[in-house]
Amino acid sequence: ATYGDPGLKKCNESDVPRPISAYGGSKLMMEMLCKDYMTAYGLSSVGLRYFNAAGADPEAEIGELREKETHIVPLAINAARQGKTFKIFVDKYPTEDGTCVRDYVHVMDLADAHIKALNYASENLTSEVFNLGSGAPASNKELLETVQKYTGKMNIEIWGNRPGDPAYLV
C-alpha cells in the first residue's frame, strides 16, 4: 500500500513510497511517526510492509471473521465450493497473462515475522521497515487455476481493470 503502483518491478524497502490510497498514506504516516518518536524519545519500532496475506492457522485454533469477504483466495475457494460465479479483473494489465500479479505470504509466516520484529526492536535502537512477502509471486489467473486444480472447474466472469489496482505488487 505504501509503494502505490511500482510498475512492473519488485518493491524494495529503499524505494520511495508513493501511496495511491488513504490506507497506504496512513501506513506511511505511521512509519514516519515511529521514526520521529525514535529520534525524539528513543522508542524503537519496526514497520512491516506485507504484500498479500493468505492462509489460515493450520491447527484451526484461531481465524478471522469478516462481515464481507474481500480477499481473492477465500472468495475463489468459496465460489468454487458453492458453484457460484467468480468475477476476475483481467485482460488489460501489462503482465504476462493480463491479470494482476501479487506476492502471497502465509499468515503463520507473518505471525513469526511479528515476533522477530518485536525482538529486533527491543534489542536495537532503530526505526526500520521491512517488506514481507513469499518471493513467489502469482497472477490472479494462476491463483484461479490452482483453486480449480483442487476444487474442479469454476464459473469465471471476466471484468475490466479495477481502478487503482496496480498490475504488479511484489
Where are these regions (language model features)?
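Alpha-helical structural signal
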Residues: 47, 73, 111-114
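C-terminal substrate-binding subdomain of Rossmann-fold SDR/epimerase-dehydratase oxidoreductases
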Residues: 78-170
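Hydrophobic pocket-lining residues within nucleotide cofactor-binding pockets
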Residues: 53-54, 93
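Catalytic helix-loop patch of NAD(P)-dependent Rossmann-fold dehydrogenases
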Residues: 2-52, 59-71
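A short secondary-structure junction motif
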Residues: 3-4, 9, 57, 83, ...
